[in-house]
Amino acid sequence: MIQVEDKIISMNIFKKYFVCDLNACKGACCVEGDSGAPLTAEEEKKLNNIYEKVKPYMEEEGISEIEKHGVAVYDSEGDLTTTLVNNRECVFAIEKEEISLCSIEKAYLDGAIDFKKPISCHLFPIRVKEYRDFDAINYEEIKICKPACECGGKLEVPVYAFLKEPLIRKYGEDWYQKLLEATKVLGK
């Protein structure tokens, strides 16, 4: 572990390599899992506010689940998450050419909304656990991301470098620069 400000960071963020390979994994992170994407209360509010603008990008099954249950639910561990379709894929997942993508991100890229996607999705495979006095930043290694680990290894791109944009979105440019300073100390 290494500390940057009040963030405790797993060494795997520096040691492991990662670059998403959608052609290999087919966007499985939007489909596989026991619960939806973790959300903050602010993100749930944002999703409710932009839902009508995202809706044209969504698949019917996702729309139907949101109409029944809303954009977010509490999972079995009591965490706020995006609602699922058939207890499997995120309601915002869409399939294009056999690859699962995010309808929120598609709406963002088209300029329909100003919200890219939930930060937990943007940061994946980093998972952040917020405590009262610090954030724990960990790397979640899962089987479906094996192609991303292989691709990152070939390109020699560590997790923290691949996720530069979402880390800056979450913690700011100044914090990310301090993280880069820490990598120099670590020899990464």
Where are these regions (language model features)?
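Short loop/turn segments that flank or connect secondary-structure elements
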Residues: 1-188
